[in-house]
Every structure is written in structure tokens, then in C-alpha cells.
Design a protein with these regions (language model features):
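Charged, amphipathic alpha-helical coiled-coil/dimerization segments
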Residues: 71-127
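Terminal interaction helix/tail motif
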Residues: 4, 8-10, 104-147
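N-terminal leader segment of winged-helix/HTH proteins
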Residues: 1-31
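A structural signal for well-ordered alpha-helices, especially hydrophobic packing surfaces
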Residues: 18-21, 48, 102, 136-139
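Regular, well-ordered alpha-helical segments
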Residues: 19, 23-26, 74, 118, ...
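N-terminal helix-turn-helix DNA-binding core of bacterial DNA-binding proteins
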Residues: 23-64
Length: 147
């Protein structure tokens, strides 16, 4: 398959995938955890720990992310601290409750999705696993280049 065909298939497939992920997260989440709040918690868990970093990734204003962060702090899922290297920067971290909730949602959403994988053969499952590994590496590489 040509690179242009892969790129086109990616652009067509990923939005559909995100809709499914959003659906699984909604099924697995506590009522107060919207998909946007889930994404912020995921971002913080993987090391994006300032409002500006998260806002840039989501393509929204800092004010919009700040509201989500404030609600997550108020609910006890995130905590703020002053950066040890630059006192002007406020860093975000998951609390124990936030990490526990995020883990629970991910597990339940994965379980929801797993039932659909039954229609794939063992060979297709292996190919899908390798493709997802490649995508994960590609996303990490792109993110590193952006920083």
C-alpha cells in the first residue's frame, strides 16, 4: 500500500475510531466524567502537565482547558503544584483517586471493545496488534518532534 493510501485511510478511519472510543468511555465512566475530562486525565497521566500543553494538544484555548482542570481539581482527580524549576508554572498531576478512576475507565472501556474483537481471526488480531504498536510509535515520534 502506498503512503498516500495509508494517509488517506488513516484520516478516514481515526475519526470513526474516536467515536467508538468516546462511546466506550461513556459506557464505562462515572456520570461526571465526560470524554473531554477523560482526555485531560489521560494527557496528565502521560506527562503533559500544564494547561497550555493540554490546550495546544486539544486545539482549544487555555481558558477552556482551565475550566475542565478546575472541575477535575474540585472533584479530587487532579492536583496542582508549583514547578520546582520555574515558580511561574503550575503543574498538574493525577491524585490517587484520579489514577484509580482513569485505570477503571480504561479497563472497562477495553472490556467493552474486546467483545468486538471476537469477529477477527488470530492472524488478523496479530496484524492489528502490530499496526497499533506502529501507530503508537509514530504518535510518540510526532509528539517529540512537535516539542
Amino acid at each position: 500500500m502506498k503512503k498516500s493510501e495509508i494517509a488517506s485511510k488513516y484520516i478516514k478511519t481515526i475519526p470513526n475510531s474516536m467515536s467508538l472510543v468516546r462511546h466506550y468511555i461513556k459506557l464505562a465512566s462515572e456520570p461526571e466524567v465526560s470524554f473531554a475530562r477523560f482526555r485531560v486525565m489521560c494527557n496528565v497521566s502521560r506527562g503533559l502537565n500544564t494547561v497550555s500543553e493540554i490546550a495546544e494538544l486539544h486545539g482549544v484555548s487555555c481558558a477552556g482547558i482551565s475550566k475542565l482542570v478546575e472541575s477535575l481539581v474540585s472533584d479530587g482527580y487532579l492536583e496542582r503544584s508549583v514547578s520546582p524549576t520555574d515558580r511561574r508554572i503550575t503543574e498538574l498531576d493525577l491524585t490517587g483517586a484520579g489514577a484509580k478512576l482513569l485505570s477503571k475507565i480504561r479497563k472497562q472501556a477495553s472490556n467493552e471493545f474486546e467483545s468486538y474483537l471476537n469477529q477477527l481471526t488470530e492472524s488478523e488480531l496479530n496484524k492489528l496488534g502490530r499496526a497499533l504498536d506502529c501507530l503508537e510509535s509514530l504518535f510518540e515520534s510526532v509528539q517529540e518532534r512537535k516539542n
